[in-house]
Amino acid sequence: MHKILKKTIKYTACGIGMLLLAMILFVSILYFSADMLTPDYTPKANGELVQTDSLREYAGNYLRQSNSGLWELKVSGDAFQRGEAIGKLSSDLLYYQEKVFVDQIREIVPSDNYLKFLRFFIVLFNRNLGENVPEEFRDEIYGISLSCTHEYDFIGTPYERQLNYHSAHDLGHAMQDYMLVGCSSFATWGENSADSSLIIGRNFDFYMGDKFAHNKLVSFYQPEQGYKFASVGWPGMIGVLSGMNETGLTVTINAAKSDMPTASATPISILTREILQYASTIDEAYAIALKRKTFVSESILIGSAQDGRAAIIEKSPEKMALFTSSGNQIICTNHYQSDTFRNDERNQENIATSDSPYRFARLQEL
């Protein structure tokens, strides 16, 4: 009996050991096979950075700080040229923004060992992120990354870091219960506006500290493909949180209640960048959103001068809907309104436990 017990323990221990070894091998394969699809470009001497007072110029592009304190960026060319110009013009701002972001993470995770584990987890989680970001935007991010510091290479290469940072808004969803994300927006048109024109308003509440919000950037893009557009963000951010293109199409995003994502997909700001650059109508915006899988839930308020109205694209990792208004106004906070999502358990929980319905009611009063 004693011998049988010893054999049982021995074989069980061997089995557990082999299972652990197989798991370690599997995780190692995932980790070392992670591919962010780093572009292969050789920088060219396209020009010289010229700086006078508050104006910086490089290869026909410029960055200046206006009297309001906002930074204004104008870039043109192909994707890599745009990214390279952004990097050359704003290298100090890129460093400041990244330092503030990493310092904020260090406050939350002060242990270097935990930070190393966090990096390991992010590599595993976002191992296929490159596949979910269109090549044009990867090229632009790569151009920017050439001017980024190597001080934080323990997190990843400059390109890998900049690509991952574009998930910052999405990662905020995981902290939504802590009120890092809570936006409000509205649109009104027809008899509800003084001159019958389409009016869009929004409040962007994504808080990562006062230092993170110190350098606000208004970017004016003249891409070789698609429409010219303007967007508001921060240095290094090529995704769109709020913006308008030359056809009069506007985009604003509002977080919705999400389950914790289990795998990487397209960051929501990259999806809305694609919409802003390539859509002129609500239907075109919807078609672009339909072809991309996102890993968080979001409401995207689309205003269209050509359509003369606005609508909300409600999107989750599993499904999508277009919510329209029967009247001349539409309101968007942080819960879904369409028949597709209205009765979902997560949406009902969000309505019951967040301030989203109260902000919605306040916008109705205004």
Tell where the protein language model's regions lie, with residue ranges:
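N-terminal type II signal-anchor transmembrane helix
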Residues: L5-T38
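C-terminal, well-structured catalytic/ligand-binding subdomain of enzymes
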Residues: F26-D153, G190-I199, N203-V232, M237-L366
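Gly/Pro-rich turn-and-neighbor structural signature
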Residues: I144-G201
